[in-house]
UniProtKB/Swiss-Prot annotation:
Signal sequence segment: none
Keywords carried by this UniProt record: Ribonucleoprotein, Ribosomal protein, RNA-binding, rRNA-binding
Known role: One of the primary rRNA binding proteins, it binds specifically to the 5'-end of 16S ribosomal RNA.
Protein's UniProt name: Small ribosomal subunit protein uS17
Keyword check for RNA-binding: yes
Annotated Pfam families: Ribosomal_S17
Species: Methylobacterium nodulans (strain LMG 21967 / CNCM I-2342 / ORS 2060)
Taxonomy of the source species: Bacteria, Pseudomonadati, Pseudomonadota, Alphaproteobacteria, Hyphomicrobiales
Length: 85
């Protein structure tokens, strides 16, 4: 089964080897037909402390690192993935 990959913005890098990433999703409301924005914060493992606040990054599902951390930062961040595409 493939691992899910999400794109978001780093909102906190104060913890050691951990970043908090805000991921926004958009959907059309079934009755109002209006685009609705919802966001969720994910704690992700950042082994080398490379991500900085405000940076756009990709996170990938992984094994549990702790009670809250079940995602990891994709190596290289958004710049590396964008250049490959």
């Amino acid at each position: 089964m493939p691992k899910r990959v999400l794109q978001g913005v780093v909102i906190s890098d104060k913890q050691d080897k951990t970043v908090v990433v805000k991921v926004e999703r958009r959907f059309t409301h079934p009755v109002m037909k209006k685009t609705v924005r919802r966001s969720k914060n994910y704690h992700a493992h950042d082994e080398n402390n490379v991500a900085k606040v405000g940076q756009t990054v990709f996170i990938e599902e992984s094994r549990p690192y702790s009670k809250l951390k079940t995602w990891k930062l994709v190596e290289g961040g958004a710049e590396a993935v964008a250049s490959e595409a």
